[in-house]
Amino acid sequence: MIAIVDYGVGNIANIERALKELGEAVIVTSDLELLGQAEALVLPGVGAYAPAMARLEETGLIEFLQEQATKKPFLGICLGMQLLFESSDEDGQTEGLGILPGTVEKLPSDVRLPHMGWHQLKNHGEAVYFVHSYGAVCDPDWIVDSVEYGRLVPAIVQKDLVTGMQFHPEKSGEVGLKLLKEWRETTCNSTQQSI
């Protein structure tokens, strides 16, 4: 069973629908016991970094998610991916979950923001749907795929059991479903592979 973390920030219904379309058993919850029983966790997110971190703190999820990320497959989507890092410079400096070393920084001012629409992944060679103005800055060894948008923007990162997708797989049609399926089949079944 996959649990989608419900903390009041995210495109939960579409993610739930996409995972169910792949035949997954899915629950949406903020209950720590149920989240702890799940085989894998998905952290969605839409909006701004600081309010999202505040919601995680209000719901008592921060330490729990930090611990769970060392025990089971953990997928952050869009803002959920950004929250995995140590901090963001959005609206000042905001501390993140610190599950992945690295920061989240505003995309360059010489490109149109937000970065919205379809963009081709360099390694997978297929287009996925993005909506964001900030992107991760992290160790290149963890970047599974990326796009160029004013700078190199990590689109998929993976370290140990933790995976992040900056784009919205649930809004990326068949390609998004394929990438979610790859995450489920590889990351959830073996920590030695990457998507």
Swiss-Prot record:
Compartments, as annotated in UniProt: Cytoplasm
Record keywords: Amino-acid biosynthesis, Cytoplasm, Glutamine amidotransferase, Histidine biosynthesis, Hydrolase, Lyase
Residues forming the catalytic site: 78 (nucleophile), 168, 170
NCBIfam families hit by this protein: IMP_synth_hisH
SUPFAM superfamilies to which the protein is assigned, alphabetical: Class I glutamine amidotransferase-like
GO biological process: L-histidine biosynthetic process
Catalytic activity: 5-[(5-phospho-1-deoxy-D-ribulos-1-ylimino)methylamino]-1-(5-phospho-beta-D-ribosyl)imidazole-4-carboxamide + L-glutamine = D-erythro-1-(imidazol-4-yl)glycerol 3-phosphate + 5-amino-1-(5-phospho-beta-D-ribosyl)imidazole-4-carboxamide + L-glutamate + H(+); L-glutamine + H2O = L-glutamate + NH4(+)
Organism: Exiguobacterium sibiricum (strain DSM 17290 / CCUG 55495 / CIP 109462 / JCM 13490 / 255-15)
Enzyme Commission number(s) from the entry: 4.3.2.10, 3.5.1.2
Cited InterPro entries: Class_I_gatase-like, GATASE, Imidazole-glycPsynth_HisH
Listed name of the protein: Imidazole glycerol phosphate synthase subunit HisH
GO cellular component, one term: cytoplasm
Known role: IGPS catalyzes the conversion of PRFAR and glutamine to IGP, AICAR and glutamate. The HisH subunit catalyzes the hydrolysis of glutamine to glutamate and ammonia as part of the synthesis of IGP and AICAR. The resulting ammonia molecule is channeled to the active site of HisF.
Major localization class: cytoplasm
Cysteines paired by S-S bonds: none
Residue ranges of every copy of the Glutamine amidotransferase type-1 domain listed in the record: 1-193
Nucleus is among the record's keywords: no
Keyword Protease: no
Record note on quaternary structure: Heterodimer of HisH and HisF.
